[in-house]
Amino acid sequence: MRLRLLRSPIRHPFYPGLPVRLAAVCKGPCTGLSGTFRELTRAATAGARARRMIFALHYPGTPFLSETQRDQLWQMFQVPVLAVLLDRSGHLLAYECEAQSGLHVGPQAPWSARVLESAPCECGRPGLRLKLAAQTALKPC
């Protein structure tokens, strides 16, 4: 699978003003940090520190962040860890909120209704979410 390398950090729709740096280039303190699990662990080893938020990036067809990995990121950075799903071109598909009860998706979600949850999220935000059970594969229709 060929993935587009990100040149700029992701802007989370629920935190658009949060300054986020790419884990691959961060070597010191920053407000927010984004990257794959591997990039984030390397960044922590290189001295990167996030003060507010970690955005763990995922791509379709790759394993979703496990609870063990989420706990490891929490231990490394001591800030909330939210999952963000990108397509192979690096475009935002779905994103986790602080309730961590599924991934919120936009109106152009590439998934069928059988994997989307329409009930309100615990965070109070409206809209469809990718069901937690469906996050294991994360493959659009």
Regions picked out by a protein language model, each given a short descriptive name:
Residues 1-141:
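Active-site glycine/GP-rich loop and adjacent strand/helix microenvironment
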